[in-house]
C-alpha cells in the first residue's frame, strides 16, 4: 500500500503553551508519511523556537490565519493531502490514517474533523456544552482535503478574518462531497 504525503499546516501566534502538545500528537500518528509546516505570525513568545524542535519548516508570514494557511499550502506543502490545524489542537493517533483512508476509498474531496473540547475551566466547560449541540459539519470547517481541491477553490479568502474556514468549506461544497471523520 502506498502512503501519499500529508502536509499538516499549523498557523500560530503566541502559542508557546499549546504548540508542543499539538506537535507531539502529530509525531505520534500511526500514518507514516507526514510533513509538518508551521506558519507563525510574529510571535513574541517561544512558539517559533518550540516548533523548530519538531520541524525545519517553520516560517514567519502573514497577519491572519488565511494568509498563513495559504502561504503554507502554496509555497511550502508538497503533499497530495493537506490538514489544517490550530496550535491548540491535539490529534488522536489514528486521525491522519483515518482521513487518508476515508478520502482514498470514498467519494470525498474533503473531511470535517470534529473537535472535542478538553479542560475543566468554566469557559472551557461552556464551550464543550455548546459544541455538544452541533455535529462536525455545522460548527467546523473542513480540516482535511486534497491539495488539488484547495488549488481549485482558490485557497482561503485573505480578506476574511475569523470565519475563513467556513468560507472555504462553502467553496468546497460547490465542487464535491465533504465527509465527516
What role is predicted for each listed range?
Residues 60-77, 137:
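Glycine-rich, basic loop-to-helix element that forms the pyrophosphate-binding segment
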Residues 25, 40-48, 89:
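A conserved acidic beta->alpha catalytic loop
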Residues 90-123:
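Conserved donor NDP-sugar-binding/catalytic core segment of glycosyltransferases
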Residues 82:
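Short aromatic/hydrophobic "clamp" motif used to bind/position activated sugar donors
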Residues 17-21, 45-52, 94:
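Acidic helix N-cap motif at the loop->helix transition within catalytic regions
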Residues 161-168:
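Acidic donor-binding loop at a coil-to-helix junction in glycosyltransferase catalytic cores
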Residues 24-33:
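Short, acidic, metal-binding catalytic loop of nucleotide-sugar glycosyltransferases
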Residues 1-25:
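N-proximal low-complexity "stem/linker" segments adjacent to membrane-targeting elements
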Amino acid at each position: 500500500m502506498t502512503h501519499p504525503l500529508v502536509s499538516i499546516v499549523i498557523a500560530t501566534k503566541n502559542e508557546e503553551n499549546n504548540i508542543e502538545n499539538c506537535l507531539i500528537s502529530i509525531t505520534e500518528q500511526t500514518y507514516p508519511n507526514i510533513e509538518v509546516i508551521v506558519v507563525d505570525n510574529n510571535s513574541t513568545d517561544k512558539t517559533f523556537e518550540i516548533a523548530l524542535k519538531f520541524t525545519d519548516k517553520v516560517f514567519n508570514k502573514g497577519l491572519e490565519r488565511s494568509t498563513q494557511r495559504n502561504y503554507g499550502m502554496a509555497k511550502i506543502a508538497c503533499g497530495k493531502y493537506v490538514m489544517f490545524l490550530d496550535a491548540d489542537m491535539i490529534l488522536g493517533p489514528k486521525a491522519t490514517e483515518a482521513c487518508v483512508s476515508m478520502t482514498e476509498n470514498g467519494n470525498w474531496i474533503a473531511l470535517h474533523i470534529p473537535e472535542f473540547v478538553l479542560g475543566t475551566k468554566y469557559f472551557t466547560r461552556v464551550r464543550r456544552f455548546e459544541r455538544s449541540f452541533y455535529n462536525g459539519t455545522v460548527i467546523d470547517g473542513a480540516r482535511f482535503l486534497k491539495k488539488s481541491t484547495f488549488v481549485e477553490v482558490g485557497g482561503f479568502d485573505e480578506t476574511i478574518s475569523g470565519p475563513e474556514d467556513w468560507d472555504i468549506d462553502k467553496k468546497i461544497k460547490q465542487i464535491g462531497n465533504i465527509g465527516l471523520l
